[in-house]
């Protein structure tokens, strides 16, 4: 874990011109992004903070807390029957009536350094009639499980389609690869003509990967920015101030295969772009590898995230986004959205506060020192002008933000009245806790009501949140819940990369730090 906290050589700011913002800096510090860097090779002990649900009408039950190692997500095959994937073992296990079956249904050779590993899976919308399961994972270049940050192919993040065979306890058989994305972050190697980039550590973070099928029966994939600094991070000329205007040693800044990151992609079940994607025509006009990739983009300007959910009432896509140090986000994603990263995070109006926090409060940039926070614009107007605008793109403020990072994580909408009618249509969100945290809430669950038109978070019950920002505090570390008290519905869940509603209408919360799966249900 200490290697994830390594300090870096401070960057000396040169001129900034049209390049911008948010930088690189404490890019991840103690790997805030969900604390998901969870020591990839070790089992994390269960949290000593009690797991508690705050509504007396609800109860939380520990469904599993033995036999799992770093669980990342689940999918339900039926009532009391689900698959669970493990981050570092590369195994997909079947659980029937609360019992882990003796033989994994799949075992992949994964690289689990930092935020890599076996990360997400999704059932085909017509499952089991169409017996396909889609898996997002990071492969090891060694042919065996590895937590060594360098032991990964350049395009080591994969989405693969597997066929489910229910015979003999079940198994998954590879059908085809849909897409391969950047995994190797080599910014410790100097770019020709730009020796200042040589003091960055090899990284495996910003590897967030979530798979979800939308109501349109198409596949949505969140891919973290991988520390890239190009078009899709709102740097049209890349991070450098003079030629060659590239992103890194593998090219860029345009989104070739090595630089397709910080995006939500919308694909059919074969991995192809949809003709009604927002930038399909633009990509066709550009042509080539870059144009083909642009055709797949649903939204861009994202940093890193581990939560996506579709509102069953409206069909809208919501996602969580991790901050560096300032301004975690909850977003409603519209087609063609530009999330603003790296020009800013949080509401555009809070840009001065964002820049102040990033440049003064956290001094040890961990990654991407070639684009530090000192280069963030000084005014919201200038920051917005610096956005890289694909035709038809639109910047939209987050629906909710936290001043300091809380590590927002898995999300799920509640559909129906199994938890009580008051919860029907609510959005639940998990969170993280920092490695340095002692005490605290130990990983909260948050519950959001939406406005009647389902377009916004309804914060009318708490006047402090009228600006849709929780001005939480920094108390020796981040992950503080101040001003979120009225949103908080649970504590002590650890880091929760996945929340799913089961066939019974209850919520199932996956805790990667507690090695546990919790069930939230209505009391009898």
Residue ranges and their predicted role:
Residues 42-46:
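Sec/Tat signal peptide C-region and signal peptidase I cleavage site
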Residues 487-492:
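Short, Gly/Ser/Thr-enriched beta-strand-loop segments that form substrate-interacting elements
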Residues 48-53, 116-118, 128, 140-141, ...:
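Beta-propeller domain segments
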Residues 31-41:
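Bacterial N-terminal signal peptides
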């Amino acid at each position: 874990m200490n290697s994830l906290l390594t300090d870096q050589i401070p960057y000396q700011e040169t001129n900034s011109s049209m390049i911008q913002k948010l930088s690189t800096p404490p890019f991840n510090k103690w790997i805030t992004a969900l604390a998901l860097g969870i020591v990839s090779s070790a089992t994390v002990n269960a949290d000593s903070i009690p797991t508690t649900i705050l509504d007396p009408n609800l109860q939380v039950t520990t469904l599993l807390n033995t036999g799992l190692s770093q669980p990342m997500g689940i999918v339900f095959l039926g009532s009391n029957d689900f698959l669970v994937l493990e981050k570092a073992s590369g195994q997909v296990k079947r659980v029937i009536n609360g019992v882990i079956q003796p033989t994994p249904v799949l075992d992949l050779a994964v690289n689990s350094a930092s935020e890599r590993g076996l990360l997400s899976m999704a059932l085909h919308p017509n499952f089991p009639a169409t017996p396909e399961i889609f898996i997002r994972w990071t492969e090891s270049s060694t042919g065996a499980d590895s937590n060594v940050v360098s032991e990964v192919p350049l395009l080591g993040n994969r989405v693969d389609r597997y066929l489910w065979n229910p015979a003999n306890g079940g198994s998954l058989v590879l059908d085809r690869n849909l897409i391969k994305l950047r995994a190797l972050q080599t910014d410790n190697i100097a770019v020709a003509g730009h020796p200042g980039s040589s003091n960055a550590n090899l990284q495996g973070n910003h590897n967030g990967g979530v798979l979800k099928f939308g109501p349109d029966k198409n596949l949505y994939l969140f891919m973290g920015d991988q520390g890239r600094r190009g078009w899709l991070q709102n740097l049209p000329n890349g991070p450098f101030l003079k030629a060659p205007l590239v992103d890194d040693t593998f090219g860029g800044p345009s989104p070739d295969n090595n630089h397709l990151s910080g995006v939500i992609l919308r694909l059919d079940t074969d991995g192809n772009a949809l003709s009604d994607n927002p930038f399909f025509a633009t990509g066709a006009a550009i042509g080539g590898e870059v144009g083909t990739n642009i055709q797949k983009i649903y939204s861009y300007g994202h940093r890193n995230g581990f939560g996506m959910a579709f509102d069953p009432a409206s069909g809208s896509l919501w996602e969580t986004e991790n901050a560096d140090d300032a301004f975690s986000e909850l977003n409603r994603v519209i087609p063609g959205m530009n999330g603003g990263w790296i020009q800013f995070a949080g509401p555009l109006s809070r840009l001065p506060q964002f820049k102040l926090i990033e440049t003064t409060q956290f001094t040890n940039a961990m990654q991407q020192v070639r684009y530090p926070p000192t280069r963030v614009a000084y005014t919201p107007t200038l920051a917005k002008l610096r956005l890289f605008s694909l035709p038809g793109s639109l910047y939209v403020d987050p629906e909710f933000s936290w001043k300091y990072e809380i590590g927002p994580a898995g999300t799920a909408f509640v559909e129906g009245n199994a938890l009580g009618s008051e919860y029907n249509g609510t959005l639940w969100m998990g969170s993280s806790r920092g490695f340095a945290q002692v005490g605290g809430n130990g990983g909260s669950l948050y519950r959001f009501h939406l406005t009647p038109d389902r377009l916004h978070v309804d914060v009318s019950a708490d006047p402090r949140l009228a600006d849709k920002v929780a001005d939480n505090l920094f108390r020796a570390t981040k992950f503080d819940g101040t001003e979120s008290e009225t949103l908080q519905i649970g504590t002590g869940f650890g880091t929760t990369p996945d929340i799913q509603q089961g066939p019974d209408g209850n919520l199932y919360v996956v805790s990667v730090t507690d090695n546990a799966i919790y069930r939230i249900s209505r009391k009898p």
